[in-house]
Amino acid sequence: MGNSESALISEKQLEIYQLETFFTRKEILHIYQSFENLNPDKVREAFMAGNYQVKMDYQEVIQLAELKYSPFKDRICRVFSEDQSGDMTFSDYLDMLSVMSMQAPKDLKAAYAFKIYDFNDDDEIDRTDLDELVNRVTGFRMKTEDVDGIVDEILKECDMDENGTLTAAEFEDILHKSPEFSANFNIEV
């Protein structure tokens, strides 16, 4: 990274970002560059004025390579957007990438994965959420009966209290038994 990028983020702000994330100074500057590339004039103008809370709207954010092809991009943006609008500040974007980094603990990843897959935001993953999850993963190409069968199996295997929903604790327990989860819930920086 050249001096032009680091000059836009104060040393104090870089230190704060390093304390609040799992990233090095160099990684933060690299992440800043990808954020800036969404709308260079808007970001540079705000950062030069010391405004690190400039927001990219959802349509700009989903152009990021890390999100562009994800079937969950709308949920990811909403969950990591401080106001749940899907619009993101650089801090929101940095938080998202930090949680999805290989350095983030599995518990933190699990908590955010739960929020992303809780499509109706009712603090549990129910049949409707699981239908949506399976449909998104498969590109909405499965028959309803097949999706229902998969959802039935998920609930049979994972719903410990047999109430038809997965709590955050049940969901986290499932993910702890899944060694590939951390690697799959990952965005390389």
Predicted features, each with a name:
Residues 1-72, 77, 82:
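Eukaryote-specific detector of the first structured module of a protein
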